[in-house]
Curated annotation (Swiss-Prot):
Source organism of the structure: Shigella flexneri
Family to which this protein belongs: Belongs to the major facilitator superfamily. Proton-dependent oligopeptide transporter (POT/PTR) (TC 2.A.17) family. DtpD subfamily.
Membrane topology of this protein: Multi-pass membrane protein
Transmembrane segments: 14-34, 49-69, 78-98, 101-121, 138-158, 167-187, 212-232, 235-255, 267-287, 312-332, 344-364, 379-399, 413-433, 462-482
Record-given protein name: Dipeptide permease D
Cytoplasmic side: 1-13, 70-77, 122-137, 188-211, 256-266, 333-343, 400-412, 483-493
Keyword Transmembrane: yes
GO biological process, one term: protein transport
């Protein structure tokens, strides 16, 4: 019997944990901006600042979490502690109605948990296979697909719980999901005994001040306290500036490490792709902030006598990614003919073009709202689905190129820099863009009147901004295509 005939048993526990982690994270994310504005009565500017700071830090901490796992905790312990912290964070978030300080503390705990979890769950999965095991790619594909299942279900379940019961119930359901995933994972603990555990030698080296686990407890208590400070706007900006400077310094070091012109060109391609990815995600991340508030205020959400909770719309994007991803994988076959760089830029142009089309649909929706008071639900669904489809032509393409680079020992670092720019910096920029929609006035009774014209203007500007990016990418695509054609003609002559 072939020992590679099926996946290792341990993978199913990792997959279960991944499903519930996505459920927990995206369920809470779907509720957060609505909770800040509708329940805590934050003004839009304050809510956007906090939301973007939270989303930015989520993409910074995995770098630290990966370092901690490599040096001290090991992937398995880091994943378990991360899951536990995220569950605790969601519980504390549900209690933030009691006192505002719980809000910042809860988000900080979730960020720390996410940092420990996200960077290490993939590494833990990798430990289940030998380097040459042919099942490896299938295992990672299974984990990715499972995560999408969680992100589809989460906004529906948590949105329903919040709408029918309470905000605490919605956040509590996210916590229950994370706890369920952790319990399932612990039930399969015996399948992970061969994976790398806690580095006791490192812990013993610091035993002269505190017991082994004392240092870990200090870290778990101090880190949320430190990150809580970063949620003030100025400090979060400073943190991103420092992280970006460090990232650029690392890029310069990698460039000097390149041994030939081919490697330098590969690095230049990755840097350029990362820049356009950053702009793409600054537009796409409006889904959790300005678009969510637009849906809540200006879209007719009634369907068959039921008012669809705003949070449920967050499932449309994930569903489109999964459905279109399956279509591309099974129906569209990658051509091996032609130049790979030309194909890469063609895909980026398509992704940015679809993003522009999605926001064009949202602009039409907003204009409809201005004329008739509310926009139609199908138009909103179509716009979000097109934007979800666009994602498939950006991140997978960029990440594939990063893994192809021939400079040894830099793939992980480049992945971290890509996440920093397309995740952390993009989310900060998304907050700046979303804040342009925060125009409101008060009527004679003191009620807030939100400006639909602000949404029209911002959605329209993003439409043209994404289209301008398409133009720039097409110029690069045309240059690469002509260069490839001229090279081919020279070889034939």
């Amino acid at each position: 019997m072939n020992k590679h005939a099926s996946q290792p048993r341990a993978i199913y526990y990792v997959v279960a944990l991944q499903i519930w982690e996505y459920f927990s994270f995206y369920g809470m994310r779907a509720l957060l901006i609505l909770y800040l504005t509708n329940q805590l009565k934050y003004n839009d500017t304050h809510a956007y600042e906090l939301f973007s700071a939270y989303c930015s830090l989520v993409y910074v901490t995995p770098i630290l979490g990966g370092f901690l796992a490599d040096k001290v905790l090991g992937n398995r312990m880091a994943v378990m502690l991360g899951a536990l912290l995220m569950a605790i964070g969601h519980v504390v978030l549900g209690a933030s109605e009691i006192h505002p300080s719980f809000l910042y503390l809860s988000l900080a705990i979730i960020v720390c948990g996410y940092g420990l979890f996200k960077s290490n769950v993939s590494c833990l999965l990798g430990e289940l296979y030998e380097p040459t095991d042919p099942r490896r790619d299938g295992g990672f594909s299974l984990m990715y697909a499972a995560g999408n299942v969680g992100s589809i279900i989460a906004p529906i379940a948590c949105g329903y719980a919040q709408e029918e019961y309470s905000w605490a119930m919605g956040f509590g359901l996210a916590a229950v999901g994370m706890i369920a995933g952790l319990v399932i994972f612990l039930c399969g603990n015996r399948h992970f005994t061969h994976t790398r555990g806690v580095n006791k030698k490192v812990l013993r080296a610091t035993n002269f001040l505190l017991p082994n686990w004392g240092w870990l407890l200090v870290l778990l208590v101090a880190t949320p306290a430190l990150i809580t400070v970063l949620f003030w706007k100025e400090w979060s900006v400073y943190a991103l500036i420092v992280a970006t400077i460090i990232g650029l310094g690392v890029l310069a070091k990698i460039y000097r490490k390149a041994e030939n012109q081919k490697q330098r060109k590969e690095l230049g391609l990755i840097v350029t792709l990362t820049f356009f990815s950053m702009l793409f995600w600054a537009f796409a991340q409006q889904g959790g902030s300005s678009i969510s508030l637009y849906i809540d205020r200006f879209v007719n959400r009634d369907m068959f006598g039921y008012t669809v909770p705003t949070a449920m719309f967050q499932s449309i994007n994930a569903f489109a990614v999964m459905l279109c991803g399956v279509f591309l994988a099974w129906v569209v076959k990658e051509s091996v003919a032609g130049n790979r760089t030309v194909r890469i830029w063609g895909k980026f142009a398509l992704g940015l073009g679809l993003m522009s089309a999605g926001f064009c649909i949202l602009t039409l929706s907003a204009r409809w709202s201005a004329m008739y008071g509310h926009s139609s639900l199908p138009l909103m669904v179509l716009g979000l689905a097109v934007m979800g489809f666009a994602e498939l032509f950006i991140d997978p393409v960029a990440m594939s190129q990063i893994t192809r680079i021939e400079i040894p020992g830099v793939t992980g670092v480049l992945t971290g820099i890509y996440m920093l720019l397309s995740g952390a910096i993009a989310n900060y920029l998304a907050g700046v863009i979303a804040d342009q929609t925060s125009q409101a006035s008060f009527d004679a009774s003191g009620a807030i009147n939100y400006s639909i014209n602000a949404y029209i203007e911002v959605f329209d500007q993003i439409t043209w901004g994404a289209l301008a990016c398409v133009g720039l990418v097409l110029m690069i695509w045309l240059y690469q295509a002509l260069k490839f054609r001229n090279r081919a003609l020279a070889l034939e002559s």
